[in-house]
Amino acid sequence: MNTAYNFIQSYTHDGRIGVLVEFEFELSVTASEPEFLVVSKDIAMHIAALAPRDVKTLLAQPFVKGEHLSVSERLAEASVRVEDRVKVKRYVRWVAESDEPQQEQPEPPAAPAAALRRSAAG
């Protein structure tokens, strides 16, 4: 069984749009790889700019920092460079003018204690 590690990247645009993106990968060192940190921030910025309706739509979109690649292709490039399988698990995009977050509806997050027990067991 493979252990999954998660990393949440944040991005804010002019204090009016906020994004949190949860990434999943197999190696704990991936979270500190410069290539991963750049692509995770860029994907969060992409979500802020284009407001995709769900992860599937996000991955199919032309990447905002280089339209010759899709978001999925850019993530695959980064995965090769960090030698790990990196995927976007879920995200939330919040607009300050709105009372509601714009997000796909994933399962609710686990209680912090349950998540901590899972990571300690792995």
Mark where each language-model region is.
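N-terminal assembly/interaction segments in proteins that build large macromolecular machines
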Residues: 1-122
